[in-house]
Swiss-Prot record:
One of its GO terms (biological process) is mRNA catabolic process. Keywords: Hydrolase. The gene is rppH. Its EC number is 3.6.1.-. A motif (Nudix box) lies at residues 42-63. This is RNA pyrophosphohydrolase.
Length: 157
C-alpha cells in the first residue's frame, strides 16, 4: 500500500460580523478555477503554528486578519486532490487541514486584491446554502467540520 503525502494546511470558516444575529458564512470563488467556491485556506510554513498560518493566510487571501477566533477543530482532516484536477502541489496527494471557526470583525475590510489574488469574488451566504455552492470534493470535509462546531455549541445556527 502506498503512503500518501498530504500538505499541512489551515482553513477558515468565516462568519459574518453580524454573527450570531445572522448565520452567514464567507465563501470565495477561485481565480484559477471558475465556479470553484470555497473557504479561505493555505499552507502552513515550516516553523509556523496553525494559528500563525491562519492569520497570515487570511491577510494574504482576503486582505484582512481582523477576526475573532471562536473555535478550532481538534484534529487534522485529510482529503485527496481529485485525479482530474491540475494543482500546484504535485509532490502531494492532497491536504491535511486544521479548521478554525472565526468571526470577521469588519466586512468592509475585505480586499481580495491586497496581495496576488487567489479569489475573483466573494459573498456571504446562509450556512444552509453552503454545500450547494462549494466544490464537490470538499463537501464531506465541510459537512464534518460544521457538524462538529454545531455539536460542541460553537456554531449556533
Amino acid at each position: 500500500m502506498l503512503h500518501k503525502k498530504y500538505r499541512p494546511n489551515v482553513a477558515a470558516i468565516i462568519m459574518s460580523p453580524n454573527y450570531p444575529n445572522t448565520c452567514e458564512v464567507f465563501i470565495a470563488e477561485r481565480v484559477d478555477i471558475e465556479g470553484a467556491w470555497q473557504f479561505p485556506q493555505g499552507g502552513i510554513d515550516e516553523g509556523e503554528t496553525p494559528l500563525e498560518a491562519l492569520y497570515r493566510e487570511l491577510l494574504e487571501e482576503i486582505g484582512t486578519n481582523e477576526i475573532e477566533v471562536l473555535a478550532q477543530y481538534p484534529r487534522w482532516i485529510a482529503y485527496d486532490f481529485p485525479s482530474n484536477m491540475e494543482h500546484n502541489f504535485y509532490s502531494f496527494d492532497g491536504q491535511k487541514q486544521r479548521y478554525f471557526l472565526v468571526r470577521l470583525k469588519h466586512a468592509n475590510s475585505i480586499d481580495l486584491n491586497k496581495h496576488t489574488p487567489e479569489f475573483r469574488t466573494y459573498q456571504f451566504i446562509h450556512l444552509k446554502d453552503l454545500l450547494k455552492k462549494i466544490v464537490p470534493f470538499k463537501r464531506q470535509v465541510y459537512r464534518q467540520v460544521i457538524a462538529y462546531f454545531r455539536r460542541e455549541g460553537y456554531l449556533g445556527c
